[in-house]
Amino acid sequence: MELLQVTILFLLPSICSSNSTGVLEAANNSLVVTTTKPSITTPNTESLQKNVVTPTTGTTPKGTITNELLKMSLMSTATFLTSKDEGLKATTTDVRKNDSIISNVTVTSVTLPNAVSTLQSSKPKTETQSSIKTTEIPGSVLQPDASPSKTGTLTSIPVTIPENTSQSQVIGTEGGKNASTSATSRSYSSIILPVVIALIVITLSVFVLVGLYRMCWKADPGTPENGNDQPQSDKESVKLLTVKTISHESGEHSAQGKTKN
């Protein structure tokens, strides 16, 4: 680009001296329109005009440039510059659009998959095979719009969750209940069995002690040798009865003797 600009600057004084003013004005206008960004420092035209050699005779020297060559070169350079400037403009606009798209995308990042996570973490409940009820939870999902600003729009989508479960899961819950009841019964049995064993041991020990006491009481020397098992108190009571009967008979005999007399 710099080389083209330098060549154009060297060609400007010769163009001013030529008769093709209309072409120069058109080329200058196109150059002014297209060159927007690059800043060009143009030297003084007077010093350039002094250095340029203008022919006076009909023969063109080697260092001079004709009008046709100037026209062709200026048109080619003008078209080249316009194409370059248009390419630069296109790239700059594309870059700005990309920046805007990225900023919009970062702004519209919404944390909305909470509904999805709750749906995945939620467990179904009980079921009857005849009817299954469903509840609707409005979840919002991010969907990009086709507009050039690329801003995201939120649309609500109803999501259904089954409240009831299959019969196999119900059977599984019943099996869990049975397992819990069996565990509790095992704990009770582990407590009851030692108590029952202790009671049996106590009753056996009581029977053994009673048997030993009776054996010792039979071997007591106060009992008679003829093998009577009655205790002394019983014998005393028998003696008292015999004494009473004897006294009663003697009283009757005395009463009969008195009546006879």
UniProtKB/Swiss-Prot annotation:
Entry keyword Nucleotide-binding: no
Alphabetical keyword list: Cell membrane, Glycoprotein, Membrane, Phosphoprotein, Secreted, Signal, Transmembrane, Transmembrane helix
Extracellular face of the membrane: 19-190
Region (Disordered): 118-183
Cytoplasmic side of membrane: 212-261
Modified residues (Phosphoserine): S237
Free-text description of this protein's post-translational modifications in UniProt: Highly O-glycosylated. Sialic acid-rich glycoprotein.
A biological process from GO: hematopoietic stem cell homeostasis
Tissue specificity statement from the Swiss-Prot or TrEMBL entry: Expressed in heart, kidney and lung.
Segment forming the signal sequence: 1-18
Pfam families: Endomucin
Its biological purpose: Endothelial sialomucin, also called endomucin or mucin-like sialoglycoprotein, which interferes with the assembly of focal adhesion complexes and inhibits interaction between cells and the extracellular matrix.
Annotated PANTHER family: ENDOMUCIN, ENDOMUCIN-RELATED
Protein name as catalogued: Endomucin
Species for this entry: Homo sapiens
